[in-house]
From Swiss-Prot:
InterPro entries recorded: GalU_uridylyltTrfase_bac/arc, NTP_transferase_dom, Nucleotide-diphossugar_trans
Organism: Streptococcus pyogenes
Catalytic activity: alpha-D-glucose 1-phosphate + UTP + H(+) = UDP-alpha-D-glucose + diphosphate
Pfam families: NTP_transferase
GO MF annotations in UniProt: UTP:glucose-1-phosphate uridylyltransferase activity
The entry's keywords: Nucleotidyltransferase, Transferase
Protein's name in the database: UTP--glucose-1-phosphate uridylyltransferase
GO terms of biological process kind: biosynthetic process; UDP-alpha-D-glucose metabolic process
Pathway: Carbohydrate metabolism; nucleotide-sugar metabolism
SUPFAM superfamilies membership: Nucleotide-diphospho-sugar transferases (SSF53448)
EC id: 2.7.7.9
Keyword Nucleotidyltransferase: yes
Family, per entry: Belongs to the UDPGP type 2 family.
PANTHER family on file: UTP--GLUCOSE-1-PHOSPHATE URIDYLYLTRANSFERASE
Length: 304
């Protein structure tokens, strides 16, 4: 059996929800306190045992490459001033086996994954989406990517991460139609449906941003016609793959943080900061103070 060694991180999106900040800065470089969102993804991959990572980028994404490259001037300056802890943080982002390829035009997630065909070769691989951060406030939690890799060791089949979402939100996700109940958190799947309307959704089990796929997916993606949004949808290709070989779904029970919109990004930043040793106490005190002020502002005033 071939070991899962490689991961793909699609990062070619335009990040329009975060304009004007993302006009010249990659959305994936927006920080949660002091760490870019893409670094959380890379760290999850490494903790899971991934050996090589390909980042699929687009225009205005050079900052991602720079972040994971050496910065001699900065490193020399930190070393000269004896700032060894900061130097260690910088070194952690450069000692990684990262590759980059550019998607010329954003044609959907399926097309972004297809750019990695030569990199992956004939091996199983993981796709990790940057909008979904998993268990970032729980250092002891088993990474979701690692869970998928362990499933593959047992089934030798593609496995997609899913999570229950409110029924009214299913139209924002790919959704699975499970075959019966899960066995130790693993579902057999009848069909995969991209962004169904709530009345048409086969379940509330939504696909979240972790996929373990066999290389046969590339042949399907090459023939895949555009789907929802006139883009090449990875969910559609997975549904086709499921017709010729088993595809399972792993239900995630941890904490998922959606940093793909402003409010989700803010919530993630607050939760992470409340566990950050340098700011958590000050932030807790500020939130308590702010909460009291907000409660006070709700008290109606009466003129005499």
């Amino acid at each position: 059996m071939t070991k899962v060694r490689k991961a793909i991180i699609p990062a070619a999106g335009l990040g329009t929800r975060f304009l004007p900040a993302t006009k010249a800065l990659a959305k994936e470089m927006l920080p949660i306190v002091d760490k870019p969102t893409i670094q959380f993804i890379v760290e999850e991959a490494l903790k899971s045992g991934i050996e090589e990572i390909l980042v699929v980028t687009g225009k205005a994404k050079r900052s991602i490459e720079d972040h994971f490259d050496s910065n001699f001037e900065l490193e020399y300056n930190l070393q000269a001033k004896g700032k060894n802890e900061l130097l260690k943080l910088v070194d952690e982002t450069t000692a990684i086996n990262l590759h980059f390829i550019r998607q010329s035009h954003p044609r959907g997630l399926g097309d972004a994954v297809l750019q990695a065909k030569a990199f992956v070769g004939n091996e199983p691989f993981v796709v990790m989406l940057g909008d979904d951060l998993m268990d970032i406030t729980n250092a002891s939690a088993k990474p979701l990517t690692k869970q998928l890799m362990e499933d593959y060791d047992k089934t030798h089949a593609s496995t997609i991460a899913v999570m229950k979402v409110p029924h009214e939100d299913v139209s924002s996700y790919g959704v699975i139609a499970p075959q019966g109940k899960a066995v130790k958190g693993l579902y057999s799947v009848d069909t995969f449906v991209e962004k169904p309307q709530p009345e048409d959704a086969p379940s509330d089990l939504a696909i979240i941003g972790r996929y373990l796929l066999t290389p046969e997916i590339f042949d399907i993606l090459e023939r895949q016609t555009p789907g929802a949004g006139n883009e090449v949808q990875l969910t559609d290709a997975i549904d086709t793959l499921n017709k010729t070989q088993r595809v399972f779904a792993r239900e995630f029970k941890g904490n998922r943080y959606d940093v793909g919109d402003k409010f989700g990004f803010m919530k993630t930043s607050i939760d992470y900061a409340l566990e950050h040793p340098q700011v958590k106490e000050d932030l807790k005190n500020y939130i308590i103070k702010l909460g009291k002020a907000l409660e006070k502002s709700k008290v109606p005033t009466h003129s005499k």
